[in-house]
Structure formats: structure tokens, C-alpha cells
């Protein structure tokens, strides 16, 4: 390979999602056919943010045919990921630019959610357009990015499928050793994953933030809905069941409710400023309150979280194909002079969409795709719940 070959740098940011390796493989194999050199930055922006070129080189791998040829079957990511955020300061952004220049990266592919894409674009804005092009492939099991034609984000189908299996087992367990399971499902702002798993498994109740019309909800609002379902089933002689709760309910709670969940302290946040919803222990707090209310009826309640075990599952066929197409689409976009764009799939075609076109003017962040509670799909899911 020529020393003058264009260099493609790839990194993953944010939480894992099934299919990350598929994007890496799809992009790498196509780039190698073009005669490019491909490198992977370990743990996202973590080492790039240091500005230490030697450190970055020590945490960079050459992506070759032998390394990536069969990884699209595998969950996780061979180049690891992190939530390091160069947008925290101009110094961090300049550190990233320094390292990209030192490694002669001409094409920069990031795989992640809106935070990762925003970070990549902010870095590129300080560089000449002929110096580097930036493309992002959107991923999240939350399925909350505003992709065209209601296209799902990659990893969602796999996460929903595995989540369904787990909840289906809990359904059998709840009946065999009578109890209620309160299942807290990942989903920072939207209820797509929780609703998808609940509907597919036939869970008795699912609560998502979108169905609450008020701007803020109280802890008691959620408690009372779950309590009503438990009592309704009890009236039919059924002292067991499964309720799925989107963790995004926490994001919509009032300050009073948040203080209750987080032990009378300010909610902790991640490097991007998002509340650490997992620390709220929503299902556990609800279980404790419901036992106070219903314990005298002999009701048993067990809290359960589903989330981390979904993120690195081997992708189902849909996601394996989808991610390979996204990887191809990223390289095709580079070849056609695109930058500051996301690769999306619409009507069977992969294409670039300018990142700025997906931003919410009010927040400057990528718009969140919420569950449409007026849709037939939501009505179908709801009609089979015990409400």
C-alpha cells in the first residue's frame, strides 16, 4: 500500500449497540478495496482528547482484511467505545485536531448517537474542508433518532428481540412462582425499546414517558398506574404479572420526584450532561412503594433491569445487513465529497443527510424521535394491556 494512500480513521462513541462491528467491517472492506489505509481509534475520543500523539498511536490499530472480514456476526466493537466528549472545551477539540493531523487522517468516520456526531462535527469545523471529511453512522438501541421514513436505528431490532425473550421468560416465572416483575428498560428519552419488548412479549403493562401529556410527572403518577393494573388482575384471581417501565420516565419527572429517586441529592450526570438514569433505581423505588400499599394483599414484587445485556448481543440478520449497508454508504459519501453528514437508509437506499438538517433549532441538538401515542401501532399495543 502506498504511503500516500488516503487514511480513514474510525471510532465508536457512546454506549454499545448490536451491529457496531458490522459498520466497521462494511466501511473497512470497501475502503481497503479502494487502496485506502484504515485505522481504528480505541475507546472513541478518549485518547484523541489528550493531544498526545504517542498515546494515540499506542491506542490505534490498523484495520486489515483479516481483522474485520467476519466480525459483522459479532456483538460489541473491536475498537471499543467511550463517552469522552471533546465538546467540553476548545482545548480538547484542538487536541483531537492535532492528533488527526499527525496521523494524516483524511476521512473520519464516527459511529454513535447525536453526541458522537456533534463532537465529530465540532472538531471538523476547525479544520479546512479539503483537509478532513467527517461522516457519522447513527446508532442507538433507543431508536430515538429522527431517521427518515420511520427507519429504525441499527441495533434496535436485535435489542428488542433479545429483550422479548427475557421478558417472555419472566412472564412464565411470574406465573410459576406468583409475583410481579417490574422491568426497567433502557431508553433515555423515548419509549420505543420498552414498548417494543413489552408488546412482543405480551407484558401486562408498559409505561413510557410519551403517554403522559403533562410536562412533568410525579412519582405517584407512575405508582398509581402500576397499582391499578395489579389490583385489576387481582380482581380476576391473578396475583402475578409483568410491567415494563421505560427508564425515560425519570427524565420527565419533577424535581421533587427526582430528589426522591436519587436520595435527596442532585441527579448525577454523564460527560454529555445527561442524567444517569440507571442510578435512579426506578423499578426498585416503585417496588418498595407498591409493597407498602399492597403488601397486606400478599403481593410479591421483584424489580428487574434490562439494558446492558442487550447492547452487545450478536446482531440479528436485519441489523447485520443494515450495518454493512451503512458502512458502504459512509465510504460512498466520502467519495462523493460529503462531510458533516449522517448516513441513513430510506426506501431501500443508503444516503447522506446533512447533520444540521436533523437539529432542533431550539436546543441545537439532534431532534428526539418519540413514540407517536396517536398512532395505530401504539393503540394496538395499548389495547392488549391490563389498563
Curated annotation (Swiss-Prot):
List each coiled-coil range. none
Major enzyme class: transferase
In this UniProt entry, which residues are annotated as the site Important for catalytic activity? 139
Q: How is its activity regulated?
A: Non-allosteric.
Localisation: Cytoplasm
**InterPro entries according to UniProt:** ATP_PFK, Phosphofructokinase_dom, PKF_sf, PPi-PFK_TM0289
List of residues binding Mg(2+): 114
Tell me if Magnesium is a UniProt keyword of this record: yes
Cellular-component GO terms for this entry: cytoplasm
**Positions bound to diphosphate:** 15
Q: What family does this belong to?
A: Belongs to the phosphofructokinase type A (PFKA) family. PPi-dependent PFK group II subfamily. Clade 'Short' sub-subfamily.
In Swiss-Prot or TrEMBL terms, this protein is called Pyrophosphate--fructose 6-phosphate 1-phosphotransferase 3
